[in-house]
């Protein structure tokens, strides 16, 4: 996710990153 929104607060960003990382792990695990 290269989207950086000034309107997002840190919590929303952290949640998005967490979801992104989980999805990436899923792909890595097959």
Swiss-Prot record:
Tissue localization of expression: Expressed by the venom gland.
Cell compartments where the protein resides: Secreted
Note: Shows similarity with the venom allergen 5 from wasps. This similarity may explain why patients with allergies to centipede venom also display allergic reaction to wasp, honey bee and/or yellow jacket venom.
Family statement drawn from the similarity comment of this UniProt entry: Belongs to the CRISP family. Venom allergen 5-like subfamily.
Protein's organism: Scolopendra angulata (Barbados giant red centipede)
Gene Ontology MF: a single term: toxin activity
Keyword Secreted: yes
Predominant location: secreted
A cellular-component GO term for this protein: extracellular region
Post-translational modification: Contains 3 disulfide bonds.
Keywords noted in UniProt: Disulfide bond, Neurotoxin, Secreted, Toxin
Protein name: Scolopendra 20528.11 Da toxin
């Amino acid at each position: 996710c290269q989207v950086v929104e000034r309107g997002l607060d840190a919590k929303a960003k952290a949640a998005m990153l967490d979801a992104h990382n989980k999805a990436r792990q899923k792909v890595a695990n097959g």
